């Protein structure tokens, strides 16, 4: 008989260790592992980690087999692994209804359970009796299901199980916006059942999604039906959130040792090696002790000061756990494995020796890993005084199966029985490797031959959509409908993937569906849902952003292929040429670089061999799921609205279409636009039916009379609901109400019925002859208010032509005419919502940016601190906007732009925790008033008239603090809007905008506009306006340097006019902007935490920030920063808020002094007021009393607001003097005397 090799003997020793410490807890029926002999429940996460040693040992036996018995032993061990994984699968499949609900609700009550009965696979506690929602546990199951399947194990047996796993992918793909209870099952560290977004959960979910994508769950025995599909945009969302969170673990935990599992084995979720090292160093420096690592700071679990009779902690109680947190040896096993994967022999040796020193010797000398080490109750005070000096005692489970398993696995790796690639067959360990540069392939396609010809006139040879046949081209939303079919299973009542927006990563792949190649255009070119895609400049800007995004985030083999359609909406107003912005973009694409991204422009056929393909085999003819099986239910977006249809040239004759063609045609036709309204007439001799002689307010006045309402209407940008009563006009800038100009009474000949009320039937008859956009809008608005959106007009004798459908058609016409204020208002009437609104909001929240909507103060200003379903989010925005439709729509728009910037330029949001959308909109209007030198109402109207591109540009200038210029220009001759169009431009170092520097383009445009104006009838100008005045409005009105806070003749926040010079107002403007966007100095919150430790609290605008906050929260917690923000945000004036922040910064200097205490509550307001008085005294002594106007709301001098922080007469100088005076008796006597 062959002698046993040394390696075989060692493996037998590990086999005995595994049997005696792990497998002895495995249930023979279900395969689940109980937590201990006393605790019979099986935790999902613990079971997976506990079986890893068995999996690793099985592979070690298979590789080092000396005898047939070794191969048999390997098979037995592997089947123990399969049995456990299938046991967990059975537990989850019994809760299939929860998986289905959770996909749509993401509610903690609809989540899979975190633990099950070991013997029966049934649940053990109620839905609301445990912190069940633990995304990392479900994700860990999928991650190792993928890894084990790739290693050769067969865990999934049937297609029903495949469908369930596909739905588990949908369950975890929204992890980046799901607040859960985390790997410690506690959520917020107060243990009060408050879920929070956990970096560990996001990281493991990202790893699982990447690992299982395109994996055949049947392994070598599978086929196309057993492949799992993952959308890459969901993975990238997780990556982005991880990058923004780390090294923080969550809102309440500034660091967590559990992050070791995502920066190294098993998840390897972080791609930035520097971020990996920073996170690891933070864990070691803040959490490591002599016996392992603490889970997180102020962790009270099993400490002597924890009350074992209650689950939750009181907030101030957390301070008691500082420096006595229990230390867990399991984290050293992570660090050993991390060292092995990184090839760091010193780290491996150091932690192996340290771990050997704290292992418990059990029966027969086997090594056991205890759960944790705790401070003896009688040594607590000694540990408080001298941390890490007291000898600890082991507590908890012995062995701790999770730690025991990783200890054995690390030993097998360290001793060479396993290679790193064997426990990571999917090569996740290379996540930090340098990626090659990405070249984005761009195919420009003309919608039809006419557009193709127009492009050729400019020297651009492109294909039309018909030319690329047999490649099919479809809008991106069709891909969302198709993916809604993925994962459907009638046997288990699984509906598949919820209808969701698919990002540019998803649409930049080529798809093979039923042996046909499909390419999908990106959804930012789709006008289906919201008006952003109606602005060609916005489309170009989004193309630039998405190309840069593709270059940064593309991870797949092959190149991304972006199909950019040039449609009829990208033509000039008269349809004779391509829009200049689109032409310029195509020329830049031809150069090979666009917005910093490397691109290759070409035909689709040229890209077929270099593109990345996804085979959507779940749509194959022999699959059980029928395309038309549920077409009226979940395959449609819940907020579908009519649009301009799909790419008609790509469709085939009806008789030649197969089922797939018919299905796509049905999707397109079901959302195509039907025309009922009479066509618009652009000729000058066509008169305005109403708008040429009557303003909107006149129509509303007549409506009020018809309704018997006594209302006074101020000049407005758009109509508002008459039934809402005495509502003020849209005015975002506080200013004194000007005297109303008397408007002559016109004799309106409204059609009336026998009861002398407005006859809506006759009004519909007048609509038939109305060919002016604004007139059609006026009539439809009256019908909307008086009859409601669902009223059937029977226009032209056609049944089912509701007011809603006519408004939808009008929306499309307004889009073609670029009437942005009208577009925004109709969007509000139709309750259109941005398809990506919920995702945009979740992106901001996931980047630790809370949102408020509506104008301050509370309760009008609503805070959004957790992701909300789209319908609930939209309703909250309308409620916070006071049902002001225009503001509600603009709020959605701003949220989308903020999300774009937080993804592309996160540095813009440095030191910002709460984005107050209402204040941002108000400041945008204020900035326009300053630059245009106009009144508040005019600025508000101008803001609503901005194109989406200009709105986004203005927002960027607000966020960045850069100067900008505003240019006026007349509208096209057929425009129904009387207010001049304006555009936002960047101001260069010369003080001129880019268009002014170029000059020629603008001059040509003005000459063309003047010629068109000269040939027009006078009726197209506002009443009483002369031709010379109209032409004069073309002149640019801009501010090349910062001027007064709201312009040389506009108003300040207190309603007073400021007559300052062009160079004044810079610092007031800066403070107003920083206060509106809640920007604070670097390290502000940590400094506030320190000063709170030396006083009883800070009083800000009547609200106290108590010192007890530091008992609960640590200085670097996001939770603490949010708490400070909540107090500061009670101040409604942004410039005053910023002065308070400056005063607090001066106060924080005291935290560095040797004083233990500064006394009671410090009143920050009094310090600011005292500083203002000192400033006024100096100004009076200089004889400048004529410009010392005060803010009526706060009493602060405008000149003080506008003073620079530094300098002899800067705000910091006076604030320092005020602090010294306010706290004089408490300051050290040896301190420097204030001058």
UniProtKB/Swiss-Prot annotation:
InterPro entries: 6-hairpin_glycosidase_sf (IPR008928), 6hp_glycosidase-like_sf (IPR012341), GH15-like (IPR011613), KPBA/B_C (IPR045583), PHK_A/B_su (IPR008734)
Location (main, coarse): membrane
Modified residues (Phosphoserine): 695, 729, 735, 983, 1015, 1044
Gene3D superfamilies: 1.50.10.10
Lipidation (S-farnesyl cysteine): 1232
Regulation acting on activity, per entry: By phosphorylation of various serine residues and by calcium.
GO molecular function (one): calmodulin binding
Keyword Cell membrane applies: yes
Biological pathway: Glycan biosynthesis; glycogen metabolism
Stretches with biased composition (Low complexity): 1039-1055
Origin superkingdom: Eukaryota
Assembly, per entry: Hexadecamer of 4 heterotetramers, each composed of alpha, beta, gamma, and delta subunits. Alpha (PHKA1 or PHKA2) and beta (PHKB) are regulatory subunits, gamma (PHKG1 or PHKG2) is the catalytic subunit, and delta is calmodulin.
Main function: Phosphorylase b kinase catalyzes the phosphorylation of serine in certain substrates, including troponin I. The alpha chain may bind calmodulin.
Protein family membership: Belongs to the phosphorylase b kinase regulatory chain family.
Protein name (Swiss-Prot/TrEMBL): Phosphorylase b kinase regulatory subunit alpha, liver isoform
